[in-house]
Amino acid sequence: MARIAGVDIPRDKRVVISLTYIYGIGKSTAKKILAEAGVSEDTRVRDLTEEELGRIREIVGRLKVEGDLRREVSLNIKRLIEIGCYRGIRHRRGLPVRGQNTKNNARTRKGPRRTVANKKK
């Protein structure tokens, strides 16, 4: 397995897919990286030369990925919570932040249902 940005990327997959195993790199970013490095998207990781791997590592090194990106995202969320804005309050309460409906759905954010007992008639 080749290591890029501290992540072991799978050898048997195409390079464009393998790069998406790195947090912060999706398909479009992976394609841009390979175009800049001059590597074909169809190449398998095991077929890359050390020179090509070095060029890819250098380009990925200039991007904000993995730990740095995770830290920035968590600091942004902490900042929103501290200033007490609407989005921060939604984060604090564990509710959807981007305006989604919460009457019926939003189970991913709210967690399992907490059933409320009915008053007997």
Curated annotation (Swiss-Prot):
Q: Pfam families from the entry?
A: Ribosomal_S13
List the residue ranges of the region (Disordered). 94-121
Q: Output the superkingdom of the source species.
A: Bacteria
Q: Does the keyword Mitochondrion apply?
A: no
Q: Under the cellular component aspect of Gene Ontology, which terms does the record hold? A: cytosol; small ribosomal subunit
Annotated keywords: Ribonucleoprotein, Ribosomal protein, RNA-binding, rRNA-binding, tRNA-binding
List the molecular function annotations (GO) for this entry: rRNA binding; structural constituent of ribosome; tRNA binding
Single Gene Ontology BP term?
A: translation
Ranges of compositional bias, category Basic residues: 106-121
Q: Report quaternary structure and partners.
A: Part of the 30S ribosomal subunit. Forms a loose heterodimer with protein S19. Forms two bridges to the 50S subunit in the 70S ribosome.
- Family assignment? Belongs to the universal ribosomal protein uS13 family.
Function, as annotated, reads: Located at the top of the head of the 30S subunit, it contacts several helices of the 16S rRNA. In the 70S ribosome it contacts the 23S rRNA (bridge B1a) and protein L5 of the 50S subunit (bridge B1b), connecting the 2 subunits; these bridges are implicated in subunit movement. Contacts the tRNAs in the A and P-sites.
Known PANTHER family for this protein? 30S RIBOSOMAL PROTEIN S13/40S RIBOSOMAL PROTEIN S18 (PTHR10871), SMALL RIBOSOMAL SUBUNIT PROTEIN US13M (PTHR10871:SF1)
**Protein's UniProt name:** Small ribosomal subunit protein uS13
Q: Which gene encodes it?
A: rpsM
